[in-house]
Amino acid sequence: MNISCSFNERLSSASSIVLSLWLSLTGLAAVIGNAAVLWLFHKNEPLRTISNRFLASLCVADFLAGLVVDPVYIAIRVFVQPRKDSILLKVIHMVWIYSTAATVFNLCCVSIDRFIAIRFPFRYQDIITKKRCYAVIIMVWLSSLFLPLSRVLIDNNPKTVEEMWFSLSFIFFEFPITVVTLCYFWIFKTVRKQTRKITVERHQTDCADTLPRARQNQKAIKTIGFVLGVFIFSWMPSLVTTVVSYVTADECLRNKLNFVVWPWIAAIGLTSSAINPGIYVFRNGDFREAWRRHFHWFS
């Protein structure tokens, strides 16, 4: 028995306005926030540590997402909807893939760098040299550039395109979520162990200098919670939606996910580019101090 599935593939006027306003504000925040971080990184020599170079690479990816991907997404969802077989849609898909890959791969690099810094503090400078840092960053951007070619090499058959997105979803979401979660799980364990050790030392020696270290560790634990929470909130819906769309046999459900649900899921993922500077950078004391020096009128 055929069940009719009737819905409008275009967003309603109210939904279009809300989505446009949402992506405009988050895109502007991503551009301004990440541009400010990159400017501070460029102007302040003490900020150019190896760890901060990974953060700078992440900021470049988030800056490009706010500058290019957000406006393009507003255009195709609100104003002009390209045909499924058009070259324009392929180009838009390539831009989306490139931006998403660059963001999530750089997030993985930041997470792995922090894991090594906390897990192996005395060997960190030997493991993560400046040369290796640049090599990893270059590899991230080259691999991000390579992945969009998958959209060029396949035809416009809906089933083939769906299989491509399903495969990419595991590269973009499953792999990074696993890496980030494992890294911050081990960081959390290490920080908790250090905090307990500091607490014991404080009770035994009543030494006042253990208090700042304890507070620093508590702040690190809070940062871990923010990082994992925002990452999972931003990207997990994309993975779930892609998987459900691929495995379901209900054509009506698949179309509703693609045309009704996906625009909002994509907007959530793009919002992370505006949030990342606040989590990864402005919780960093050195960056906050540089911000106060250069933008004292704003602070």
Show which residues each predicted segment covers.
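Extracellular TM2-ECL1-early TM3 structural module of rhodopsin-like
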Residues: 12-24, 50-110, 117-125, 162-166, ...
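Seventh transmembrane helix
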Residues: 179-183, 230-243, 260-299
